[in-house]
Amino acid sequence: MHSTRNKQLKKLKSWHKNKKAMPAVLASTLLMAAHAQAAETTGADTMIVSANAGESVTAPLKGIVAKESASGTKTSTPLIKTPQSVTVVTRDQMDAQAVSSVSDALNYSSGVVTNYRGSSNRNDEVIARGFRYAPKFLDGLSYGLSGQGSTIGKMNPWLLERVEMVHGPASVLYGQVNPGGLISMTSKRPTAETIRKVQFSAGNQHLGEAAFDFGGALNDDKTLLYRLDGIASTKHEFVKDSKQERIAVAPSLTWLPNPDTSFTLLTSYQNDPKAGYRNFLPKIGTVVEASAGYIPYDLNVSDPNYNQSKREQGSIGYNLDHSFNDVFSFQQNVRYTQLREKYKYLVYTKNADAPATDTTILRRPQKEENEISEFAIDNQLKATFATGSVNHTVLSGLDYKWLTLEKKMWLDRNNDYSFNWANPTYNVSVNDSMLTELSTNERNKLNQVGVYLQDQLEWNQWNLLLSGRHDWSRVDKQDYAADTTTERNDGKFTGRAGLLYAFDNGISPYVSYSTSFEPNLDSGAPGTPAFKPTTGEQKEVGVKFQPKGSNTLLTVSLFDITQKNITSYNSVTRYNEQIGKVKSKGVETEAHTQLTPEISLMAAYSYTDAVTKESYTASQVNKAPSSIPRHAASAWGSYSFHNGPLKGVTLGTGVRYIGSTYGDNAESFKVPAYTLFDAMARYELGSLASQLKGAAVQLNVNNLTDKHYVASCGGDTACFYGSGRTVVATVSYSW
């Protein structure tokens, strides 16, 4: 084993000089996996095989309180013993709150800003600890594109078992991650227990939705398991004459050839023939009242007859687990993903040379095409053993990914398509032949290899976490618009050290230090060379509290993060720019508790002080980046009646507060704070009649008071209204 691993490391080091070594590296890891499957051992069962080995981090979990997670350490570890802040959103929480996006799932989490583009959030964009575009990972591997200046891809939450937020740097295990944190998504997996569920929803905004979830064993000895999830939905957006339509399906299959081996095939396909629209609005008329008042809440800046938005994405991969014996186990995750997006619209633009009033919007036609192809593989060898009185969980890994991003954008800068938002006129004739300026036409390719080593040491009540990783990355940029080709090679070591002491009373104080590294695929103006990778570091102290035998977890953390080479989107030029260094420090508190069998509560508060410390634009230095609230808070509670005339009824309510934010990176204006209220009522119809067991009805109302507000601004030409009241009625049946 050691000689094989040494050969892999030698091949890895030579890759930076010769990429032809990569097939050999991958071949050797696949041979290791094949050997693992064929080996006959008597080790402990894998997570899927054994349902009694404790809480599974991939299987269904009842309630809103998770006690274990693998996202922070890549090993199933109790959260109370993890020296890092991790938020877990369970399937039950997502169902109770009727979330329609991964961003929605994190609405009640600390340290994150979700849906800051309001109803124009066409992708899952999340700000974490003051840093934009928290990257998304699906089943341990990167999914879609999440860089400092852009994000592409949107996963339907119905296909997921849980969504987790790892707060702070996680590059030491995952590689391409910014220091704010990452979003870890876990697919619904096959189970030996039979799952049969259908669900239908309807609501305002012409919502119509049908979903199903089936799973179970395909043979008598339960060595073949399956899961099949799917959803179809259609709804109108709050922007006039703009729609979202979606069909998504995720078949998966697990094979258990022996008690020590499991192989799970994971696939998904999603087609959004109408993928939504990003509705840029001016500051005048949204944040500041114009001469004619405020811009109507449902104003469509573009033209419904011209708009076009499509998204298609699919993936196929597998998870292989094998236990050699009581000490060694091996896991391999592999996935190939492809994603395509097409958009066409009239976008609000600012042109100082064109005549305008505070009610006139100047627009230009714009067309975008994005395509991502990504392959990722992660090989993990785990050893659990003791040296004297010290218990070790050692994880060594080798991962590789390549990602190709092709971007095209056509513009027509003549600005002939203007209208008065106080008296808008639509159905304009747009001449697509005038879209002759190919402002962006490029192909970016990332190759990244990483090796990592981690040791989780436990001695009495002390828990020490030590991790180290080295990455080699290459970014090739072919800029067809500027007729240039650039290549950038980088290598970086990242590390993490965390120390936690678990008191008998359930209090666990901890301290940690970690660094981050992220190759950059963001695009600047034509002719701009490949951006430098970002680097970051974080210092964190915190305390967790989980009373023995309780279903409660409370976390308080203080963090201090610095990131260099960060990029930002310029709302005037419509290009990304590498602005320099940002420092963010703050406090996060979060609590999840099943107080009694009837009462569940969650609450969160965060204070974030983010400041640009270095920038080529002098007016941005020592100023807060846009869209980041200093204060944010939320709370959700529910009560379930188990007896009496209201037996089967669950009532829930929540409140979300987002503090004021700056509207640009120079602090030239502010966007007011806002508070939103949510509510839920559910009735298990089996309490009414035994024949209705498994049937339920549920009503969810978000933004209960239908508050109209500005979610954020990214400049005086890039403001976004928030979503209005949404009402969703759901009927479900499980049998």
UniProtKB/Swiss-Prot annotation:
SUPFAM superfamilies xref list: Porins (SSF56935)
Family indicated by similarity: Belongs to the TonB-dependent receptor family.
Signal peptide (residue range): 1-38
Residue span of motif TonB C-terminal box: 718-735
TBDR plug domain span: 78-188
Summary of the function given for this chain in its UniProt record: Involved in the initial step of iron uptake by binding chrysobactin, an iron chelatin siderophore that allows the bacteria to extract iron from the environment.
Coiled-coil annotated spans: none
Keywords recorded for this protein, A-Z: Cell outer membrane, Ion transport, Iron, Iron transport, Membrane, Receptor, Signal, TonB box, Transmembrane, Transmembrane beta strand, Transport
Organism: Dickeya dadantii (strain 3937)
Residues spanning the membrane: 46-54, 83-91, 108-116, 125-132, 169-177, 179-187, 194-202, 222-230, 261-269, 286-294, 312-320, 328-336, 343-351, 378-386, 392-400, 403-411, 424-432, 448-456, 461-469, 495-503, 509-517, 538-546, 552-560, 568-576, 599-607, 649-657, 674-683, 696-704, 707-715, 727-735
GO cellular component, one term: cell outer membrane
Subcellular location: Cell outer membrane
Disulfide bond annotation, renumbered to this chain: none
Protein name: Ferrichrysobactin receptor
Extracellular-facing ranges: 55-82, 117-124, 178, 203-221, 270-285, 321-327, 352-377, 401-402, 433-447, 470-494, 518-537, 561-567, 608-648, 684-695, 716-726
Family annotation (PANTHER family): FERRICHROME IRON RECEPTOR-RELATED (PTHR32552), FERRICHROME OUTER MEMBRANE TRANSPORTER_PHAGE RECEPTOR (PTHR32552:SF68)
Single GO term (MF): signaling receptor activity
Topology of this chain in the membrane: Multi-pass membrane protein
Motif (TonB box): 45-52
Taxonomy, superkingdom: Bacteria
All ranges on the Periplasmic side of the membrane: 39-45, 92-107, 133-168, 188-193, 231-260, 295-311, 337-342, 387-391, 412-423, 457-460, 504-508, 547-551, 577-598, 658-673, 705-706
InterPro entries linked: Plug_dom, Plug_dom_sf, TonB-dep_rcpt-like, TonB-dep_rcpt_b-brl, TonB_box_CS, TonB_rcpt_b-brl_sf, TonB_sidphr_rcpt
All residue ranges annotated as the TBDR beta-barrel domain in the record: 193-735
